[in-house]
């Protein structure tokens, strides 16, 4: 709910989440910055959240081959799914160098659409990416993938500066981002540049940030708490690639 911004947070990717888990689906995607990735989606029972997504960098028996060959295929105009299928059909994964580099945790979140119907979205509660892969184009691919499957994705009510910046920049490049007021049960604006809605609504607050951290944020912010506000993207609002 954009949220109060906090300076940062850290989580250990090697810690297994509490609760029983069931594998729901496995996705693959490719980026020119990072190569081939796999994402395993789990349903969790008895844990803090209902779902989580483990993200892996897929190793190759020939170093950098996935990255180089995939980039060539991408430059040729091939679509993402055909590119991924081509790389997987080569059967060149090196399981010893495949490693977990990210984890996204999320839960069900209900809100009202413009026509008054109740919609169940997935609200992101934690998004952690290994430092070595934070420039690998993962976030936009993962959020697009989750939106295509679950129809609606909603941000958390507390975000790190990096998490808020993700929604205020990268997410804007993949979809229209609508601003929703939980108390009023309606959408109040559409997010534009610099952390401000196109009609002037500001969906972020900085209650606990220092002056230096507010400078690091570098965008508009509200002096009033924004715990009742969320940013929402939907499958229908995704931009064509």
What residues fall within each predicted segment?
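Short, basic-rich loop-to-helix N-cap that marks the start of a DNA-contacting helix
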Residues: 161
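Glycine-rich acyl-CoA binding loop
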Residues: 134-146
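Non-catalytic substrate-recognition and accessory regions of acyl/acetyltransferase enzymes
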Residues: 1-130, 144-154, 164-168, 172-241
